[in-house]
Amino acid sequence: MVLIRVLANLLILQLSYAQKSSELVVGGRPCNINEHRSLVVLFNSSGFLCGGTLINQDWVVTAAHCDSNNFQMIFGVHSKNVPNEDEQRRVPKEKFFCDSNKNYTQWNKDIMLIRLNSPVNNSTHIAPLSLPSSPPIVGSVCRIMGWGTITFPNETYPDVPHCANINLFNYTVCHGAHAGLPATSRTLCAGVLEGGKDTCKGDSGGPLICNGQFQGIVSWGGHPCAQPREPGVYTKVFDHLDWIQNIIAGNTTATCPL
């Protein structure tokens, strides 16, 4: 069964309402404190919502299905229990979606661009991630990261984000694995065919990093997570690059590719 991967609870907060299933980093290891400087935590009064990616001092990219009322963002987080001295908090000044009605599907337009209320200062634990200069190559080894559950079906949320390497597949692999996917879409297919490594509940909106570039956004996948021959589906950042750059440049009427 294919479900959108919305985030569970990070840090010490816990959601009190039902969420869509999201993906976690199952089968990974604790991230090095210096390798997730662009990783953002989105949360509201009910708890943690999603991950996100800082792309410059004023803008964050995450999944459209992570949108919620009155959410905040924390930058520079590593441990839930031991805050970094350089952690910073911001709120959205503006939110942009591919569709003015916030319409998106499991294979199209699951992306949200957030303008921050004030710039984030780069620091020891905070730095933006480069947007892609070219599309990723099938066969690439890519990095996933997040505070999502590291076990499934019983959920275990770690103190620090977990990271794992997964492989980028031809889209036809996901098309064959997940019922309902169209023959083509503006998404990436990534995982481990033998299973055991995957994003999962709590990781939605976070980055898929290939060769040091921000190539994908955690969107959705199989349920349970990390099953053999069921790679995850990630919004393809490169296909939305013109839209992102136009919005940042001030062209707020820019549209996403069809």
UniProtKB/Swiss-Prot annotation:
Residues 19-24 form a propeptide. Glycans are attached at residues 44, 103, 121-122, 154, 170, 251. It is found in: Secreted. Keywords: Disulfide bond, Glycoprotein, Hemostasis impairing toxin, Hydrolase, Protease, Secreted, Serine protease, Signal, Toxin, Zymogen. Its EC number is 3.4.21.-. Gene3D superfamilies: Trypsin-like serine proteases. It is an enzyme of class 3 (hydrolase). Residues 25-249 form the Peptidase S1 domain. InterPro entries: Peptidase_S1_PA, Peptidase_S1_PA_chymotrypsin, Peptidase_S1A, Trypsin_dom, TRYPSIN_HIS, TRYPSIN_SER. This is Snake venom serine protease 5.
